[in-house]
């Protein structure tokens, strides 16, 4: 493994401005998308009962755990036997509403609250569970460099690596996330957000 140090391309002032902009945009989005969020919650409640929000522990800035929020897309106790890396086509664990939400990435809406709170940024590496981080670290210990920055809702790696359903894909995602870490800027973030929105509008699954 290469003995290279990976550093955040943003300086302290840029990081503070990025966090401030994320906070303002998240506040506006929480208000603007509240009717859509309520509609999603009602649809989940009618089909499969409560809870409508699913929370899961992920690892974020400085390696600290936090709870990520999503609209529940799977049946209750879908992972009672433990985490499952492989997402099966036509996954029977998904509810009908959940499948629709995932297809249009609406299950991610509650993560606006994570951005508002400061757990996450609008753009950054996707946060992972410790269960999978431990497995990744066995193959590539560079993962800890990602702890320098807040995880994001969309990421550079998601655009070009798709759903990470195998360990080779997870390792490729790590390499892409490290590239983002070393090159991130407001302009880079804007391009990632734009490409993500285009993919969502055209129904691309990633």
At which residue positions do the language-model features occur?
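Hydrophobic transmembrane alpha-helix segments characteristic of membrane transport
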Residues: 1-6
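A hydrophobic, helix-centered structural microdomain
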Residues: 9-77, 114, 186-206
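C-terminal terminal-structure detector
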Residues: 8, 12-13, 142-206
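Short, glycine-rich, amphipathic interfacial segments at transmembrane boundaries or analogous
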Residues: 54-93, 154-173
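A short, structured surface patch at a secondary-structure boundary
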Residues: 87-150, 193-196, 200
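Positions in alpha-helical segments
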Residues: 26, 41, 54, 95-99, ...
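Acidic active-site catalytic centers that drive phospho-/nucleotidyl reactions
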Residues: 22, 107-108, 177, 189
């Amino acid at each position: 493994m290469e003995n290279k140090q990976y550093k955040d391309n943003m300086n302290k002032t840029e990081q503070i401005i990025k966090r401030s902009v994320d906070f303002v945009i998240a506040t506006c989005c929480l208000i603007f998308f509240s009717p859509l969020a309520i509609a999603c919650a009602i649809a989940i409640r009618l089909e499969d009962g409560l809870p409508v929000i699913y929370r899961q522990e992920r690892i974020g800035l400085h390696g600290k755990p936090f709870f990520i929020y999503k609209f529940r897309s799977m049946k209750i106790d879908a992972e009672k036997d433990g985490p499952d890396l492989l997402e099966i086509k036509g996954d029977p664990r998904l509810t009908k509403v959940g499948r629709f939400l995932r297809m249009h990435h609406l299950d991610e809406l509650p993560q606006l609250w994570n951005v508002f709170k400061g757990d996450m940024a609008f753009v950054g590496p996707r946060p992972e569970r410790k269960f999978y981080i431990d497995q990744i670290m066995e193959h590539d210990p560079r993962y800890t460099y990602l702890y320098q920055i807040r995880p994001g809702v969309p990421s550079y790696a998601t655009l070009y690596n798709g759903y990470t359903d195998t360990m080779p894909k997870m390792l490729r995602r790590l390499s892409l996330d490290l590239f983002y870490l070393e090159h991130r800027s407001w302009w880079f973030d804007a391009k990632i957000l734009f490409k993500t929105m285009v993919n969502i509008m055209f129904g691309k699954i990633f």
